[in-house]
Amino acid sequence: MGKTNSKLAPEVLEDLVQNTEFSEQELKQWYKGFLKDCPSGILNLEEFQQLYIKFFPYGDASKFAQHAFRTFDKNGDGTIDFREFICALSVTSRGSFEQKLNWAFEMYDLDGDGRITRLEMLEIIEAIYKMVGTVIMMRMNQDGLTPQQRVDKIFKKMDQDKDDQITLEEFKEAAKSDPSIVLLLQCDMQK
């Protein structure tokens, strides 16, 4: 293991320009910042959790970060390299609504079986509540829903065939037909 290259290889850069929503210049800047924070060129779960803790200092971000990490780590090797990082960032920050829905579904589908169960959804919603902290959550959560009540409300709107699981199709259809569902998923009730 030598020192990680401080520059992206031209073929990697070209590939990322083609497969993300970032320009060549933006990718170079992101890579520079990524190497500054991760000199090894990869992030493990603990390092990833530390980044989340910086962004959410008033709550416990560790559980949510664990789920985000799983979603970022496309090859399942227990680390996030720059490619995985920038591709996920591209989708979450600049992707189409459809791409964002696919990414969110992946995060909620904990076991990757193509369906979201009530327990899976509850785990993510509880992690969001913990991450943002009690005081902020009380401000955001003007409807006063507990995590379980929020899950029940989401399932009522999304689970079209009432089989207690949400497929990708149900997820997308409901989110497109009722944008307030997306707010429920984010636990952001500010209008």
UniProtKB/Swiss-Prot annotation:
A lipid is attached at G2 (N-myristoyl glycine). The keyword Repeat applies. Keywords: Calcium, Lipoprotein, Metal-binding, Myristate, Repeat. Residues 24-59, 60-95, 96-131, 146-181 form the EF-hand domain. PANTHER family: CALCIUM BINDING PROTEINS, HIPPOCALCIN-LIKE PROTEIN 4. May be involved in the calcium-dependent regulation of rhodopsin phosphorylation. GO terms for biological process: central nervous system development; regulation of signal transduction; response to heat. InterPro entries: EF-hand-dom_pair, EF_Hand_1_Ca_BS, EF_hand_dom, Recoverin. Ca(2+) 1 binds at D73, N75, D77, T79, E84. Probably binds two or three calcium ions. Ca(2+) 3 binds at D159, D161, D163, Q165, E170. GO terms for molecular function: calcium channel regulator activity; calcium ion binding; protein domain specific binding. Belongs to the recoverin family. Pfam families: EF-hand_1, EF-hand_7. The gene is HPCAL4. This is Hippocalcin-like protein 4. Gene3D superfamilies: EF-hand. CDD domains: EFh (cd00051).
